[in-house]
Amino acid sequence: MVTTYIKSDLQLDGRQFFQPKDNLKMAELFMECEEEELEPWQKKVKEVEEDDDDEPIFVAEIASSKPAISNILNRVNPSSHSRGIKNGILNRGFTASFKPTSQRCLNSASNPVAALPVNFHPESRSSDSSVIVQPFSKPGYVTNSPRVLSNNSSELLFDLTQDTGLSHYQGGPTLSIAGLNETSFLSKRPSGSDISSVNPKKPKPSENTSGIDASSVISSEKSPSVISLQVVPSQGANCSSSQSKNGTTFPRACPKCDIHFNLLDPLKNHMTYCCPDMINNFLGLTKADNLNSANEAKTLESEKGKLIMLVNDFYYGKHEGDVLEEQKTHTTFKCFSCLKVLKNNIRFMNHMKHHLELEKQSSESWEKHTTCQHCYRQFPTPFQLQCHIESTHTPHEFSTICKICELSFETEQILLQHMKDNHKPGEMPYICQVCNYRSSLFSEVESHFRTSHENTKNLLCPFCLKVIKIATPYMHHYMKHQKKGIHRCTKCRLQFLTCKEKMDHKTQHHRTFVKPKQLEGLPPGTKVTIRASVGPLQSGSSVTPSISPSTSTLQLSPPEPDNVTAKNHVKLTTSTPNTTISDPSKANETKSNGSKSKNKSKVSNMQKKQSTLSSSNKKSKVNTALRNLRLRRGVHECIECSSEVKDFANHFPTYVHCSFCRYNTSCSKAYVNHMMSFHSNRPSKRYCIFKKHSENLRGISLVCLNCDFLTDVSGLDNMATHLSQHETHSCRVLVEQVSVCIPTSERLSEIKTEAPTKGQEPVSKETARHSRAEGEPGASHSGSKQDKVPSSEEGTGCDASVCEAAAATHCEKDVTVSDTENVSSSKNILSHDPDVGTDTMEKEEKTHHACQEMELKVDQSSESTNPTEAELSSETRQGLQLTSGDVGIDQFLRQGDEPKSVNSDASDPGSVRLEPLTPSEVLEYEATEILHDGDDPSANTSDTVSDQTGGSPGGSNPCRAETAVDLADGEERS
């Protein structure tokens, strides 16, 4: 809420003009205007001949020999009409209060008058002065064209507008204080407290008359709807021009969709989206009118020692530079990247920009979603980037945008503070290095280069405005700007490759280049008021929240204490933080310092409340359907991110599309995981969204039945691509129960090193035969021939090959094995496989236990027999030939290189091979194995028999016993 007090001392030759009966020495006129609603209906100040006021809010007419400069007042809420009035009687002074009802009152402190209308005629020789308060029979009618009652009267007529209607007063030529027409709501927005007064020509002295010292106060910038009153001379029928040139009254309709609006602000906001090309013509706004009204305001204010300037005139400007006729060369440029030849420099620059966009799209970088394509700034999130583009890089000009930085701010007050802290008057940081053309706007320099330096050798860098004349260095320079080591200027949009270039740019170019013309020739000490715009504030930049409908109450009250005046004066100064506003009373200015901090805190609190209200309204509009959604009781889990959904409106804020692929989602977490997992440059830091369910996918592999192509779960897309390329091929899914403790990479290496699919059936046949041979003569032969065991290397290799063959038969579900015992034993092996390899503590315990057992057996044995290596090798080969049948030796030995499938018994030599042992430990186990096999063959035989019959899982490996039986058969036959 912005409150303005206007103090007007009316005196002539030391005598008072209005002198009440309570013998006050001076009648002081205080006008309090409270603004509660944003309504941009303020119009351009014109003389009566050109006045086109469609909605006159306040009209006053004063007859005088010379016109006085006008006042600009604010509209107020009718809820404040009772202030200073008690039981229909004013407290003191000379007060007129307007109400939206039919009752109106005008009286002095001692003589209240209840009848309406009331004419107050002070005694005067030269002219009669009357004050008329116009009654309203209904609150919804408006007086559009007031006329005076007599030719020689001086009237002050107050007129309130709420709706449409007409009421007339007839009279002759007078002076008119006319409200602004609707064409000036964009061309003039008074923001500071600007005081200007003109002393009219003094008439002859009389008893109760005095001259008029008209003091005008321009309303605060933070008042969204402003009424401008101008005292202008009017003669004859000119006083009724506001009625004849009013045009259509509200409600108005959109010219495109014919939707009716009662207020101008909603209509303007609607037209910006519906028909932005028709808004200027529809509202009758031209650039010339804007400049004329701004120049008139500056001229009037400069007469009183104060200058009011706009941000565009004070900070922005351009310099034409050197006027040189550059020779057109029509040089062609070749792109070394795509080898395309461009006809001129402008086309080559466009081609490089196109290359940059393609590179960003193909790089799958997260920066593409957060970098502005207009000013190349980076933002934390794509949402902030979208907000920046919509608020800054738009065809519509907003009064909260810094055109130098190309940034948008929340309010005009924040913009003014930013301009004061970062920029200088007449600052032009963007320079054309060819002709020294300068401007405060980057777009002007770029368009100047494209028009003035076309068909030349010059190539302009859009990042730092550097000019290069050769294509290859220009491309290298252009691509260097894409690296992360660039240096951005904090006061404009340029970015440089070195820190020195950035510092030179800041010191040389971010300062006043050309002093504004309005500041030339001003006397020292002139106070300059800077405003963001002359039109009304945008709907989102008002300081006070819109609570009540736009109605106006004007209250004339006697002087109040100084502290109240000081507080209201501070409210004016806070609207323009970089301006010092003069006040007629020095005492009020000194006393206002104490209350300045309090009022600033109030303004900030109101801004916070308004922002929270607007944000909550936006959120409620977006999530209306989700907030009203009825759900069942219990825990709801998101199927995309596997997290609990507590608030559906917050968990699913909006529907987003991935720009790289066809992924669409409403879950914000799932979108972030998708972008980081599939479109990030760092695969090591990818987020796995299926972390909880990843163990279920392990052990699944896909194999092509027509070729050797094999892949795991992570290569499903590769298998799909393979099958699409080979239409005759088909694949099979192999599922294996894999424990969580086995790492995935170990299993993948095991699958990928297996034999091709074509060779799997012979291997399974060999395994089946091998298992049958295992059950028939195994127990009888192993008792007597167990002392001839081959060396640890060959024996272990044979065991591993046979066990791996058995494991392969279990992994493939399509291969059937006739021997049920062998299948059960292979499952037993696979079930114990995971318990061996990963748990370090179990390894150490089992290894320590095995060492103790072997040491005890070595102590008990007294003799050991070691057959020669040649005999063992020949016996082993014979045994392998018998067991392998028709399987080739190359194919069989190839399986020996595969990872071993071992039992959980750590005392078995086969399982020891997989443990991470040092060479010394390996030698120790080999020695103890030989001693153990030679000394106690009966123990191994019993273990073998127990394993073959499906004994306890703690026994020896059946593959080991199987190999021992085959070796024994080979010895007998030899």
Curated annotation (Swiss-Prot):
Q: Where in the cell is it found?
A: Nucleus
Q: Where is this region: Disordered?
A: 188-216, 507-624, 751-797, 815-974
Q: Which Pfam families match?
A: DUF4195, zf-C2H2_Z280C_D, zf-POGZ
Keyword Cell inner membrane assigned to the entry: answer is no
Q: Where are the zinc fingers (C2H2-type)?
A: 333-355, 370-393, 400-424, 430-453, 459-481
Segments of skewed composition (Polar residues) = 571-587, 612-624, 817-829, 861-884, 938-950
> Where on the chain is Phosphoserine found, per UniProt?
557, 904, 907
Residue(s) of cross-link: Glycyl lysine isopeptide (Lys-Gly) (interchain with G-Cter in SUMO2)? 44, 46, 86, 99, 138, 201, 222, 245, 287, 304, 752
Q: What is its main location?
A: nucleus
Q: Biased-composition ranges for Basic and acidic residues? A: 763-775, 830-860
In which residue ranges is the amino acid composition biased (Low complexity)?
539-557, 591-611
Q: Which GO terms describe its cellular component?
A: nucleus
Q: What keywords is this UniProt entry annotated with?
A: DNA-binding, Isopeptide bond, Metal-binding, Nucleus, Phosphoprotein, Repeat, Transcription, Transcription regulation, Ubl conjugation, Zinc, Zinc-finger
Q: Does the keyword Coiled coil apply?
A: no
Top-level division of the source organism's lineage = Eukaryota
Disulfide bridge partners, by residue number: none
Which terms in the Gene Ontology molecular function aspect does this entry carry?
DNA binding; zinc ion binding
Q: What does this protein do?
A: May function as a transcription factor.
Its protein name is: Zinc finger protein 280D
